[in-house]
Amino acid sequence: MSADVIQSLLELSHQLGGERLRMVILGEGNTSVRLDDDTFAVKASGSNLASLKVSDVTQCAFSRLLPLLDTTAATDVEVDQALLAARVDPASKKPSIEALFHAYLLTLPGVRCVGHVHAIAVNQILCSPRAREFAEKRACPDEIVMCGLESVFVSYAEPGLGLSQAIRREVVSFVKRTGRDPKIILLQNHGIIAVGSSPKAVLGSLLMVEKPPRSLSVPPPWVVRSS
């Protein structure tokens, strides 16, 4: 694995995992970077973003995970076996279960980095009746620049294969409907995914999507339930 690329992944992970940003707690969240046409590096299962080390990053083969997204059904055991088989180094740690959607998102045009967090300010909205409207609206011009005109919205699904398939389905639908590639994907009752050309771009998008709900003392109108 390229030392510089992995170092940039570690730096992003430490920033996202830090207490100041309040984007994750304990083992929440994960990050990944594309290494080349065949492989990517992703946070290992059971590791912590704030303290992520090189040994907590697992290199995986796209070809061993992407076909799983086309299966109509797979048991938890089969998914675990696929995750273990995807490791380039069999001695490395098992990749996160969410490596499945990282593998897909890293194949999108221009995407070389993915960050997934459970930001408290945003999750307050994603766990509300106005979650979908939050994905469709923007509160300030900078949010449009960093996060796009709207976000992909994914209805709640249990983490694992089902969620990864739902993400792919909604991204494909979004691109077809808007003609644009997404920057932010919002997962109902779960969290945020940012995709970008670099760790810096991903960090910027995640900071910006959290800005409106964090800075406004009065929630935007799409958060407040109509009477």
Predicted segments with their positions:
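Glycine-rich flexible loops
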Residues: 1-227
